[in-house]
Swiss-Prot record:
<dbReference type="Pfam" id="PF12280">
    <property type="entry name" value="BSMAP"/>
</dbReference>
<keyword id="KW-0812">Transmembrane</keyword>
<feature type="signal peptide">
    <location>
        <begin position="1"/>
        <end position="21"/>
    </location>
</feature>
<feature type="compositionally biased region" description="Pro residues">
    <location>
        <begin position="45"/>
        <end position="54"/>
    </location>
</feature>
<protein>
    <recommendedName>
        <fullName>Transmembrane protein 59-like</fullName>
    </recommendedName>
</protein>
<keyword id="KW-0325">Glycoprotein</keyword>
<dbReference type="GO" id="GO:0001658">
    <property type="term" value="P:branching involved in ureteric bud morphogenesis"/>
</dbReference>
<keyword id="KW-1133">Transmembrane helix</keyword>
<feature type="glycosylation site" description="N-linked (GlcNAc...) asparagine">
    <location>
        <position position="90"/>
    </location>
</feature>
<comment type="function">
    <text>Modulates the O-glycosylation and complex N-glycosylation steps occurring during the Golgi maturation of APP. Inhibits APP transport to the cell surface and further shedding.</text>
</comment>
<keyword id="KW-0333">Golgi apparatus</keyword>
<comment type="similarity">
    <text>Belongs to the TMEM59 family.</text>
</comment>
<dbReference type="GO" id="GO:0000139">
    <property type="term" value="C:Golgi membrane"/>
</dbReference>
<feature type="transmembrane region" description="Helical">
    <location>
        <begin position="263"/>
        <end position="283"/>
    </location>
</feature>
<keyword id="KW-0732">Signal</keyword>
<keyword id="KW-0472">Membrane</keyword>
<feature type="short sequence motif" description="Microbody targeting signal">
    <location>
        <begin position="335"/>
        <end position="337"/>
    </location>
</feature>
Amino acid sequence: MAAVALPLLLLLASLVTPTPARDPFAPQLGDTQRCQQRCRQHHPGSPPAQPEPEGPSESPNNKAILISACERGCRLFSICRFVAKSSRPNATETECEAACTEAYVKAAEQRACSEGCWGQIPEPETQLEQKDLALDPPRGRLSLRYLFSMLCSDLMSSAQGFLSSSWTYSLQTDNRKVVVFQTQPVAENFAFQGSHLQRVEVTWRRSHPKALELHMDPVGPLDKVRKAKPRVKTSKAKVESEDQQESDFLSCMSRRSGLPRWVLFCCLFLSILIMLWLSCCTLVTTPGQHLKFQPLTAEQHKGLLVESDWPLYPPLPPPAYEDSTPPYKLKLDLTTL
């Protein structure tokens, strides 16, 4: 009996063991778990939850600070790549190192942060997998509607390229982090440190492609900060058509009317079908416009005859008479009745 109960207990223990929380922004920023694991392997030690940088400089605390700086380097590289929208790892690595230099003062922390930037550089195979996943359309019932919507979006975006909007997402994760994302080249990150909340803002300058600003300012004690609710804000901006996301005609109409995008697409598609059906029905049901000639009677022929000013036929020449002998002259005086 004990031999049977032991495997059952082990199975229940494996089911009860909590699974590690996954970053909800991994599809947008990329998975940083592998980079953070490399940081922990490179700097062995169990780091506490975001220690204070002003604490005593002991060996375990120093290792924890280095691990935190390395993990922050991983996140900074992902944020820089998301903000700059660039697939060149060298340029993103330079921006990440510049952000690490501005974020930390000590050389060891800057070096650890730079190591996090180096560890987050995607491998070629990972990049190919991400491209395949991005290009692969969703499968299932919505695949046909997805193809139609993408076709209409491409057609409408070429005509409505000047309209653009930037989305801002503010979400709170399970590990007490409030992260703010938006499509404009500004990304904000709220990192929890001890009992205080710190705001990290990364700003990308258009005039200087290699200039990346990083600002860190404390928000206040955590007790005074309410639990942030997910909210979405929109703001209008004029940007180039290459940097636009969700700026097509259907998205603009969906934001202005409040209706889902698929409802607008169905209405547009049905209206086109109705117009085609009406045009075809008009061609079929319209009576013929051909003139039918009916034979006329004799009275109708007489009424249609009109005397013309010119002869219908050329004049005939006068008949020619043959020459005859002159008439006889009769003398009436000599005649007797």
